[in-house]
Amino acid sequence: GEANRGLGYMFQMMNGARIDVGLGAACISSAAYYASLEYAKERPQGRKLTSKDPLSPQIPIIEHADIRRMLLFQKAVVEGSLALLFQCGIYEDLEHVTEGEEHENYNLLLELLTPVAKTYPSEMGILSCSQGLQILGGYGFCEEFPLEQLYRDVRIHPIHEGTTGIQGMDLLGRKMMMKKGKAAQLYLVEVRKAIKEAEADAELKPFADKLTVAVAQLEKVTLHQFDVAAKQGPEMFLADATLYLEFFGIIAIAWQWLRQATAAKKALQKNPGEADTNFYQGKLAAFRYFFGYELPKIEGLSHRLLNGDGLTVTMKNEYFED
């Protein structure tokens, strides 16, 4: 390479490594999901709340709504994360086979999504593995089952190749403003393509409308953050960059779930066999879970990001003492 270009070359390498970290976290989370799913199918405990017969046989814990909620959380996180990582892989492939402006556009999309693809699977992978361990109960801590190992293994991923805090500052402080905001605009075009396609399906349109609102919130929050940067300086601007990354990540995964739901609906119209039908219905269930349970979390994050009071900037070290 050229002299005095080492730092730039290193960051090119780091971008690929960061996506690999996200993929590693998603793989660990996937293993945890399947391990807890298998256990939930086999472990009998309790009875249906509607059952009045104390002598009736106990049911597998997967029959309990709270267990299904935890499994749906795992499925939504794992498969949403993998979809985003695959999307990054597509952009990387297209970057290699295109030239000129088209090549630059795919490069910008990949650059923008790299901190998200690294962080969302890593941070949410910890929570996903935690839910898997919770499903196993006390057995989750025992070496006879894989969850305790997976839970420990996934914890490193928000740390190495750039901590979550660094990724947040990279996204908000650099990637969103890259090429005068061109990367962000290209990304919004991609999301709106998915929204437009989903709107053609009457059952998916309400979900497409929810993502439209989320995208508008993303634009509002981002413009507000840029205003903070101009008027209050870099410390205030980047104080909650990690929260901005979380906010952005939830919307990005919602985008991927809307695309998966659109594909699943089209596949079901072809009347597939029982196994494929269950697969696509499972996709739609996880999609509904994400839009019903995870996407609403952006409301609180949006409020926080629009109403920053600088507490973390002005807090004195002495105030942390007992």
Regions found by a protein language model. Name each.
Residues 1-25, 45, 168, 177-213:
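FAD-binding core of flavoproteins
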Residues 7-22, 56, 62-76, 103-115, ...:
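Glycine- and acidic
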Residues 87, 104, 108-186, 289-317, ...:
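Alpha-helix capping/hinge segments and adjacent helical runs
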Residues 1-17, 37-62, 221-232:
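A glycine-rich, basic-preceded beta-loop-alpha segment at the flavin cofactor/substrate interface
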Residues 70-133, 217-236:
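Accessory "access/gating" subregions that flank catalytic or transport cores
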Residues 41-55, 86-103, 133-144, 267-275:
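Short, glycine/acidic-rich hinge or "gate" loops at secondary-structure transitions
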Residues 178, 194-322:
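C-terminal amphipathic alpha-helical interaction region
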